[in-house]
Amino acid sequence: MANPFRAEVKQLYKALLFLGREYPKGADYFRERLRAAFAKNKDMRDPDKIKQLISRGEFVVKELEALYYLRKYRALKKRYYEAE
């Protein structure tokens, strides 16, 4: 029987992998950590726990997006405004 969360987990993995390209410590570092995190939970069968892990992954996606937006904002502010 196929796991009903398979597509959602794959989408989350792809989204995180895409966001990891601009990670401050480097894409290779991020990719290794991401792969290890997903491999650690590969045998999970409890639907409630899987939902919880997916929610946590979506939270990480939002945090990474916020990190990147903040970094871009700081770079623009640094270029166009004088130091206070």
From Swiss-Prot:
It comes from Danio rerio (Zebrafish). One of its GO terms (biological process) is respiratory electron transport chain. Belongs to the complex I LYR family. The gene is lyrm5b. Transmembrane segments: none annotated. GO terms for cellular component: mitochondrion. InterPro entries: Complex1_LYR_dom, Complex1_LYR_ETFRF1_LYRM5, ETFRF1. It holds the Pfam family Complex1_LYR. This is LYR motif-containing protein 5B. It comes from the Eukaryota.
